[in-house]
């Protein structure tokens, strides 16, 4: 789309006039990508001025438009540097240049389209908002330096920001990105801020969230319903919050994307109290530490993990806790891992620094968890705070800059130098994934994919880009459904309304029910769960349309045959929206449905039953079950009443965790498998040389992985004695190796000429298994894809659904269910 030429131009924003020699040329450039809210127009202004070019730059809803005039060589250098020198937060996707007639110089400045200097023009609004919205990013080093510089006028200003840092996604209401279209519209700039805003030599030139102590926003502290006297002064508010935290209070802290609940990380009683208030169970809390040096004292952090911790995204990074780290056991019960993050907002930096003139020490580590009950959405509005924080927090460190779109913290692991996303949210969302390969150069319909039931995100496509939402959460409550609907409305208002929808084919998913209600006359594509996982992986790597084999291991997914899948080997060809199930884990009964998911001992008993192993009392899952429970399960399994056939690898991990007496009941999803991985990781080096465990996961001729021999071998090993070679950790490690061996064997058997393999699904958050499978497959000559952009768990599901729907729209003769 050609960008509009403005009908009138504002006064130039300070640049010297240049005479126009003969031989000049003029070009119109349209720049797309992440180019709004990142200081791109000021950058273009500085670049054009440096090269002695004239013209203008502006935003419309879909792009940055530029008209620039000067010598051809300078224009070429200008176009090249648009990419090479772009601002840190910008991502230039495409630059389209068109030669247009030159405009003669007008020394009097009377020609509105050709002033004698390069300048920024007003933004223009189009019907559809195609430009990507930038994510929120951490405060930059320059702003941190000013925050603690007594000579700077923004000294200790909790909302300091510039064009290179700060909130974007959470404050944008509409595009183009200008201050009136953000939540900063309520804070008129003071004269000094306005001067900086209009000065092209200033770092805050056209920085929309610009503010200072004179023009707000304001920070305050309160206990209960009453503000504490004098705490509307920044230092008094910070000092009061530090004091409350030191005394053992839980303090709600309003951040960029919502409220956190903060407390001392070293106080067992306080952490337990917070866990009780949130109804958290045993799921670990994240810990925010003062700086990287502090983080290194708490955990073993390599250079790659340090780079992610200090990146602009500032995610929570899962790292190995150091022995003796001053962290309460209740922070991450039974886990050697800590989820650490560094301060990313000015308020965080102030909270971790001593207040001038105060003798109160600043904290060095705080539990920092979303302000919500478990399984509810994060608290982020003033109304939310009034209604929900009273039961969760003793005090609130608050401010009056509204949050328009909530956004939880992101969570990652670092595997061999690369990020493995666990939760993609703040710092990453809503950056788009390029799915141009799915559109094949044609106009693709905008699709809304509603994701899954757990770890929900949704995805909206716009042309060749797929926009994945921030983390929404588990769709088990009315509050989360409302948050989902609100987030969908915000995204579609920023972009465009979908003409097609996609959902998981599970008939009981709330997301599917919602999509069916909302579809009206629009097509709704029901996408098989594991197929969506595989396509999301191919999409993020730009490998759509290539033949591939997907190893898709997770806990639960509705199969095309109505059974529970989760141990799948799928093949796709040139049509990625079609798949063939070429292998799987053998089915066992899932007794009691969700009850078996919450109680790994039930899955262990089901696998023992399927393997023909008697439930003797020396077996841990038998000992962990009551007589009544055993009778019920025996009746269900023998009669096949209340049982669904299940081929889930996640449930096999649960069963083995229970059989090895690791975990029989869970407080949160994946707990048993996570603890099994920890046990196996600690033993992996020693167990690697142990030839005597005899654990194998055999693969039949038709690509079925049979767990029965493995279960029999585990029981035999457990009963053979307690010598070093049959320790439980060694068996846990041997089980991981057996699964990896089976994966390599089945893929080699079914792949034929295909050399591309993807590892996806929530089970591949298990780094020990991920590495083992990847190593074995590479040894056999396969190219192996793993997730780097969206999570392998259900948080990445919506991207795959969206792509399948886009492809189905282009190939209406087919559907998304399996072939053959």
Describe the residue ranges of each PLM region.
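Intrinsically disordered, low-complexity, mixed-charge
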Residues: 1-209, 213, 217-220
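Glycine-rich beta-strand-to-loop/alpha-helix junction loops that act as flexible
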Residues: 254-258, 503-506, 555, 649, ...
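Conserved phosphate-binding/catalytic loops in two-lobed NTP-binding clefts
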Residues: 504, 521-533, 756-760, 767, ...
């Amino acid at each position: 789309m050609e960008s509009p030429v403005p009908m009138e131009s504002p006064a130039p924003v300070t640049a010297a006039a240049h005479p126009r020699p003969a031989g000049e040329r003029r070009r119109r450039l349209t720049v797309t990508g992440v180019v709004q809210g990142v200081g791109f127009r000021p950058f273009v202004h500085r670049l054009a001025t440096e090269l002695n070019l004239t013209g203008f730059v502006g935003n419309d809803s879909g792009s940055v438009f530029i008209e620039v005039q000067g010598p051809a060589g300078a224009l070429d250098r200008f176009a090249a540097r648009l990419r090479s020198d772009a601002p840190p937060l910008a991502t230039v996707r495409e630059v389209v240049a068109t030669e247009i007639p030159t405009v003669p110089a007008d020394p009097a400045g009377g020609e509105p389209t050709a002033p004698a200097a390069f300048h920024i023009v007003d933004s223009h609004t189009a019907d559809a908002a195609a430009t990507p919205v930038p994510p929120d990013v951490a405060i930059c080093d320059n702003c941190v330096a000013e925050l603690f510089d007594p000579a700077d006028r923004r000294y200790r200003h909790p909302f300091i920001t510039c064009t290179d840092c700060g909130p974007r996604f959470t404050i944008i209401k509409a595009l183009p990105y200008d201050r009136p279209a953000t939540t900063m519209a309520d804070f008129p700039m003071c004269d000094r801020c306005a001067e900086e805003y209009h000065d092209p030599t200033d770092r805050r030139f056209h920085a929309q969230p610009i503010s200072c102590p004179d023009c707000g926003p304001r920070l305050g502290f309160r206990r209960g319903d009453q503000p504490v006297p004098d705490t509307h002064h920044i230092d008094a508010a910070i000092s009061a919050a530090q004091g409350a935290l030191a005394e053992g209070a839980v303090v709600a802290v309003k951040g960029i994307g919502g409220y956190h609940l903060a407390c001392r990380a070293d106080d067992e009683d306080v952490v337990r109290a917070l866990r009780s208030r949130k109804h958290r169970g045993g799921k670990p809390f994240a810990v925010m530490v003062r700086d990287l040096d502090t983080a290194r004292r708490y955990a073993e952090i390599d250079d790659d993990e340090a780079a992610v911790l200090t990146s602009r995204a500032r995610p929570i990074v899962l790292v190995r806790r150091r022995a003796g780290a001053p962290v309460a056991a209740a922070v991450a019960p039974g886990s050697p891992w800590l989820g650490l993050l560094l301060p990313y907002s000015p308020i965080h930096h102030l909270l971790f620094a001593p207040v001038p003139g105060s003798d109160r020490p600043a904290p060095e580590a705080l539990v920092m968890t979303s302000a919500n009950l478990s399984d509810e959405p994060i608290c982020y509005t003033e109304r939310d705070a009034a209604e929900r924080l009273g039961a969760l927090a003793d005090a609130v460190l608050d401010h009056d800059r509204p949050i328009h779109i909530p956004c939880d913290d992101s969570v990652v692991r670092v595997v061999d130098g690369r990020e493995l996303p666990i939760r993609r949210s703040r710092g990453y969302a809503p950056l788009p994934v390029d799915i141009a390969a799915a559109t094949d150069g044609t106009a693709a319909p905008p699709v809304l994919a509603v994701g899954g039931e757990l770890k929900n995100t949704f995805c909206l496509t716009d042309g060749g880009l797929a926009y994945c939402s921030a983390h929404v959460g588990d769709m088990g409550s009315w509050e989360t459904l409302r948050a989902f609907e609100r987030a969908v409305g915000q995204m579609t208002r920023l972009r465009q309304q979908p003409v097609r929808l996609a959902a998981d084919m599970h008939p009981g998913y709330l997301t599917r029910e919602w999509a069916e209600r909302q579809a009206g006359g629009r097509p709704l594509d029901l996408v098989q769960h594991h197929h969506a996982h595989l396509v999301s992986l191919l999409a993020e790597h730009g490998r759509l349309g290539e033949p591939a084999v997907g190893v898709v291991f997770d806990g639960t997914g509705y199969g095309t045959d109505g059974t529970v899948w989760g141990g799948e080997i799928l093949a796709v060809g040139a049509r990625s929206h079609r798949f063939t199930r070429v292998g799987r884990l053998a089915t066992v009964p899932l007794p009691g449905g969700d009850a078996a998911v919450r109680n790994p001992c039930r899955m262990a008993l089901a696998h023992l039953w399927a393997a023909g192993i008697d439930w003797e009392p020396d077996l841990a899952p038998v000992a962990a079950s009551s007589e009544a429970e055993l009778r019920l399960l025996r009746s269900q399994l023998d009669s096949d009443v209340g049982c669904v056939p299940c081929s889930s690898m996640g449930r096999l991990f649960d069963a083995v965790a229970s059989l090895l007496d690791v975990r029989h009941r869970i407080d949160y999803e994946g707990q048993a498998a996570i603890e099994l991985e920890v046990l196996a990781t600690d033993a992996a080096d020693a167990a690697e040389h142990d030839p005597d465990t005899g654990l194998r996961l055999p693969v039949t001729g038709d690509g079925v992985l049979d767990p029965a021999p493995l279960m029999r071998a585990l029981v035999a090993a457990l009963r053979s004695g307690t010598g070093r070679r049959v320790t439980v950790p060694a068996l846990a490690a041997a089980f991981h190796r057996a699964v990896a061996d089976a994966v390599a064997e089945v893929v080699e058997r079914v792949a034929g000429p295909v050399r591309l393999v993807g590892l996806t699904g929530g089970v591949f958050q298990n780094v020990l298994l991920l590495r083992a499978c990847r190593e074995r497959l590479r040894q056999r000559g396969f190219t192996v894809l793993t997730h780097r952009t969206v999570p392998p768990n259900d948080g990445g599901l919506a991207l795959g659904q969206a792509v399948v729907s886009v492809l189905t729209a282009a190939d209406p003769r087919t559907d998304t269910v399996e072939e053959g």
